[in-house]
């Protein structure tokens, strides 16, 4: 007897000796196991972890090997149809290896209106986060594109259809503010179904918040914002930041629109063109600037940025951010305030404002003391050089302070009085008094009077933004 025959014989004996097989007929045994299999829950987690070896093109239907498909940047090897990419794949495609630095990774969405459909919004968020390993539908960070530094935001359609909620809006707004402060070019890759209905008015508010941040970035800082619309880009994303770019690129055959094709067709009761809401149709009507295939995206983006960066100065308008302010609180404190505002409806508005002002007061003085020590060292160095050389020009040092910003922080009136008190330690080292500085227009006051329901960015009338400006 061969080894294979011996193994087969042992298997047959083991099957025949099982109690359920020996006591039942073959037909009854089949029916019993069929019912048990139907009642047994399917393990979707195990199925989702299995990697497919083959994939089918959504346009031409060609079956292709998954590894070759991924190496070709999710392009069909037959018809070059652009399939949806994940945010990680998009980062690997656009950003130089080793230069990606993520921002605001830890911000996670909450359930502000306790929304429930087939399951609660909180459960849906948790399951999606565990499945994808992401906190929300956008990744933000900085990186190099052909050697040019960019602030980059990339949306991921896998996370609840790339819908824009409070976290997506907050991360993009912080990214834009960071790019404004650092003077970086901005690239946002859109892939979204629109505003997230599970968050109600909180999601709709993000459209205005992102657009307001872009207004400062584009019209005051005069920096370059490139918008890349991928398939699909619809709803509130299209109605806000996706169409506000200085340059708007799109991938071939991308679906870009506001309402869905089926909704419009049912409303108008007439047939729509085949190319309706496609990037080719939008290019024909002038809504986008260029359709760029995926393989040329990096070169196209870097070329536009190079033209903008290296243009002669007479063709460029220098930006002046008159009322820009950076986040006054650390991200951890902001996150605590945000969650208290959204989740705890019992917390009163005055309580949140008091917490904000108290924390602001502490952090402002910490930063001012740090700045004060820096100014002390500068003045001591200047006095030392003046003793050694009487011809040493101290006025330029005093006037410019190496472009040090005294306060790009919002400081309350009480903090101002303590800071600029004649007996304060700061004024002992400061070379000019306040009246002299005002006459030379070296200090500008920008009163922030707007009231915002976004508690993190709430400012009071007593807040100032003071900046020491040189010649």
Curated annotation (Swiss-Prot):
InterPro entries: AcCoA_carboxyl_beta, Acetyl_CoA_COase_Trfase_b_su, ClpP/crotonase-like_dom_sf, COA_CT_N. Residues 53-323 form the CoA carboxyltransferase N-terminal domain. Gene3D superfamilies: 2-enoyl-CoA Hydratase, Chain A, domain 1 (3.90.226.10). It is found in: Plastid. Signal peptide: none annotated. Zn(2+) binds at residues 57, 60, 76, 79. Pathway: Lipid metabolism; malonyl-CoA biosynthesis; malonyl-CoA from acetyl-CoA: step 1/1. A zinc finger (C4-type) spans 57-79. It catalyses: N(6)-carboxybiotinyl-L-lysyl-[protein] + acetyl-CoA = N(6)-biotinyl-L-lysyl-[protein] + malonyl-CoA. It comes from the Eukaryota. Its cofactor is Zn(2+). This is Acetyl-coenzyme A carboxylase carboxyl transferase subunit beta. It comes from Helicosporidium sp. subsp. Simulium jonesii. The gene is accD.
């Amino acid at each position: 007897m061969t080894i294979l025959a011996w193994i087969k014989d042992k298997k047959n004996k083991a099957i025949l000796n099982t109690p359920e097989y020996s006591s039942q007929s073959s037909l009854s045994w089949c029916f019993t196991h069929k019912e048990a299999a139907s009642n047994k829950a399917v393990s979707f987690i195990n199925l989702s972890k299995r990697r497919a070896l083959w994939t089918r093109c959504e346009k031409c239907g060609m079956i292709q090997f998954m590894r070759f498909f991924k190496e070709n940047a999710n392009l069909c090897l037959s018809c070059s149809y652009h399939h949806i990419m994940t945010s990680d794949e998009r980062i690997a495609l656009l950003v130089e290896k080793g230069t990606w630095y993520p921002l605001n990774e830890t911000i996670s969405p909450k359930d502000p209106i306790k929304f429930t459909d087939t399951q609660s919004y909180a459960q849906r968020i948790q399951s999606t986060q565990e499945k994808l390993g992401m906190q929300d539908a956008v990744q933000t960070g900085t990186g190099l594109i052909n050697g040019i530094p960019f602030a980059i935001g990339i949306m991921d359609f896998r996370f609840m259809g790339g819908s824009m909620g409070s976290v997506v809006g907050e991360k993009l707004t912080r990214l834009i503010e960071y790019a404004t402060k650092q003077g970086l070019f901005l690239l946002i890759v859109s892939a979204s179904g629109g505003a997230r209905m599970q968050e109600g008015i909180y999601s709709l508010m993000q459209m205005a918040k992102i657009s307001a941040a872009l207004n400062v970035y584009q019209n005051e800082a005069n920096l370059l914002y490139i918008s890349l619309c991928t398939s699909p880009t619809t709803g509130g994303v299209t109605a806000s930041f996706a169409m506000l770019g200085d340059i708007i690129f799109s991938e071939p055959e991308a679906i870009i629109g506001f309402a869905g094709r089926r909704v419009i067709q049912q409303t108008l009761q007439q047939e729509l063109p085949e190319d309706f809401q496609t990037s080719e149709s939008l290019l024909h009507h002038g809504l986008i600037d260029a359709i760029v295939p995926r393989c040329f995206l990096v070169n196209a983006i870097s070329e536009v940025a190079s033209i903008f960066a290296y243009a002669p100065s007479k063709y460029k308008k220098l930006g002046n951010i008159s009322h820009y302010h950076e986040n006054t609180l650390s991200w951890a404190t902001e996150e605590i305030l945000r969650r208290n505002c959204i989740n705890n409806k019992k917390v009163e508005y005055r309580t949140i404002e008091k917490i904000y002002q108290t924390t602001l007061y502490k952090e402002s003085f910490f930063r001012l003391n740090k700045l004060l020590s820096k100014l002390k060292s500068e003045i001591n160095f200047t006095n030392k050089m003046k003793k050694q050389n009487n011809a040493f020009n101290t006025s330029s040092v005093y006037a410019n302070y190496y472009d040090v910003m005294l306060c790009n922080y919002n400081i309350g009136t009480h903090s101002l009085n303590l800071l600029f008190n004649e007996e304060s330690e700061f004024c002992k080292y400061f070379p000019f008094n306040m009246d002299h500085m005002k006459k030379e227009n070296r200090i500008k006051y920008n009163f922030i009077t707007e009231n915002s329901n976004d508690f993190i960015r709430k400012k009071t009338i007593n807040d100032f933004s003071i900046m020491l400006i040189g010649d």
